[in-house]
Design a protein with these regions (language model features):
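Accessory cap/linker subdomain of secreted extracellular hydrolases
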Residues: 141, 148-227, 242, 258
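Alpha/beta-hydrolase active-site loop
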Residues: 97-117
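Glycine-rich nucleophile elbow surrounding the catalytic serine of serine-hydrolase chemistry
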Residues: 128-138
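C-terminal catalytic histidine-bearing segment of alpha/beta-hydrolase fold enzymes
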Residues: 96, 235, 247-295
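Alpha/beta-hydrolase fold nucleophile elbow
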Residues: 118-130
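Short substrate-entry loop that stabilizes the transition state in hydrolases
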Residues: 49-51, 57-95, 241-245
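N-terminal cap/lid segment of alpha/beta-hydrolase-fold proteins
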Residues: 12-52
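Short beta-strand/loop motif that positions the catalytic acidic residue
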Residues: 228, 234-236, 240
Length: 295
């Protein structure tokens, strides 16, 4: 039962392994990134014009799930972006589990991009879904190189990572992220019948709502989105069965208003579920938001 405590942080099921695209249109070059401990794929249409990089982050399925999203990659490249699909666990050379992932790993990705020909340095857009959205916002709050964030079904706080097994769960919960060798403060998932029911039924939103009632823990683990150095788009789903992405997005919007955030920010909510991020109205909104920011 305790194993279930934090398993509810999972994103919707997606392909566990990336298949390197072989059906890209002519003119788009794909290459693997395996240097300085990184594991990712990079997509670019060669051009003499400097291009802005978009880093795409998956959720708790691990690996490079965006490398499978050929249609989305092509759309972003056609808008003038170069695209990095970046794994941060669950891939060769990386941790097996979503636990204590060093944020410094992503600084290596920023550095790698800064060394690439015709890539605009230190001006990156991040797009993440579920735990990847939590990560994108967290990185934006700590690294000024992040100048745009698209957060799909995001969390407003840091949550723990799933345990490795029952014995591991009995030892306690651990943050999904670390910085400077220390765990990033997180909101624990309480052990209760609400948690148990959520894990049995698959409807886990109430479980997270209970965790979010702990005001002191929430404030300590809140992502400082007001520190992000550029525009933010929150995309949420009113029938989200994983966690309350609509409520958490609204909380972050209020936080930005209260702190006089000087960049553009908006929240688009859709009457659908956590796993339906690619449906047409949602994806059209994301493209429209990023359009015109590619250079």
């Amino acid at each position: 039962m305790l194993l279930m405590l934090v398993a509810g942080c999972a994103a919707p099921p997606l392909p566990p392994k990336a298949v390197f695209p072989s059906n890209l249109p002519n003119g788009i070059v794909a290459r693997s990134i395996r240097s300085d401990g990184l594991n990712g794929d990079f997509f670019q249409r060669p051009s003499r014009k400097p291009q802005r990089a978009l880093i795409m982050l998956g959720g708790s399925e691990g690996g490079k799930m965006w490398s499978n999203a050929t249609n989305q990659i092509v759309e972003f490249v056609n808008e003038g972006y170069c695209v990095m699909s970046l794994a941060y666990f669950g891939a060769d050379g990386l941790p097996n589990d979503l636990r204590g992932i060093p944020l410094e790993y992503f600084a290596k990705a920023f550095h790698w991009l800064s060394t690439q020909e015709n890539v605009i340095p230190n001006d990156y857009a991040l797009l993440g879904v579920s735990r990847g959205a939590e990560l994108a916002l967290l990185l934006g709050s700590r690294y000024p190189e992040v100048r745009t964030v698209v957060a799909i079904a995001p969390s407003s706080v840091v949550f723990p990572g799933p345990p490795k097994g029952l014995l591991d769960a009995l030892r306690g919960q651990h943050s999904a992220w670390s910085f400077g060798g220390k765990e990033v403060t997180f909101v624990p998932i309480p052990f209760s019948w609400t948690t148990l029911r959520g894990m049995i039924t698959g409807k886990r939103t109430r479980m997270f709502e209970k965790a979010l009632q702990k005001k002191k823990a929430v404030e300590a683990a809140a992502i400082r989105v007001e520190n992000i150095q550029g525009p933010i788009l929150f995309v949420s789903f009113s029938r989200d069965q994983v966690w309350p992405s609509t409520w958490m997005s609204s909380q972050m919007m209020q936080r930005l208003r209260d702190r006089g955030f000087r960049f553009h920010y908006e929240h688009s909510d859709y009457d659908t579920t956590h796993s339906n991020w690619s449906f047409e109205p949602c994806w059209a909104k994301i493209l429209d938001f990023l359009r015109g920011q590619a250079s």
